[in-house]
Amino acid sequence: MIKSIWIAGGCFWGIQKYFDSIIGVNHTVVGYSQGNVINPSYEQVCTQTTNHTETVQIDYDDRFVSLISILEHLYQIIDPFSLNKQGDDVGSQYRSGIYYVDHDDEFIIKDFLLKKQNQTPKKIMIEVERLRNFNIAEEYHQKYLDKNPNSYCHVDLSLSKKEFR
């Protein structure tokens, strides 16, 4: 069955490129979520006044990749202990988050993060919320690293080869 989850972890360019290489991920689109402005521009989001975060919508086939696997991948490519910062990207629009629409996913996500939290004394800074809104980003941001392969990316794209069950 095709399901969707929305994730944030710094600049959305690298997150999208990474998840596009995961078997079972059918489609990704980058955008802005959880904010208080309808259809914000990138420039507005960068002012940190809209409360949006750069987010990737991931549509996946759960026969080939599980939500747990997607969460494991996210956890390995971000610094889960960092607030409003990933790599060189700093600001509330770069905060880490997992956003869901399916109530069953909420339990899976919270259980996953609780298990991770129990393995470390550091506080995990990934917000978990029901998706309130998602506005698709400008076209030039879509598949940005495919169009601009030498651009900055905070994500180690080679980690996508690791499999999680």
Swiss-Prot record:
Disulfide bond entries: none
Active site: C11
KW Oxidoreductase (keyword) present: yes
Catalytic reaction list: L-methionyl-[protein] + [thioredoxin]-disulfide + H2O = L-methionyl-(S)-S-oxide-[protein] + [thioredoxin]-dithiol; [thioredoxin]-disulfide + L-methionine + H2O = L-methionine (S)-S-oxide + [thioredoxin]-dithiol
GO cellular component, one term: cytoplasm
EC code: 1.8.4.11
GO biological process, one term: cellular response to oxidative stress
UniProt keyword list: Oxidoreductase
Protein family membership: Belongs to the MsrA Met sulfoxide reductase family.
Function: Has an important function as a repair enzyme for proteins that have been inactivated by oxidation. Catalyzes the reversible oxidation-reduction of methionine sulfoxide in proteins to methionine.
Name of the protein this chain belongs to: Peptide methionine sulfoxide reductase MsrA
Species name: Ureaplasma parvum serovar 3 (strain ATCC 700970)
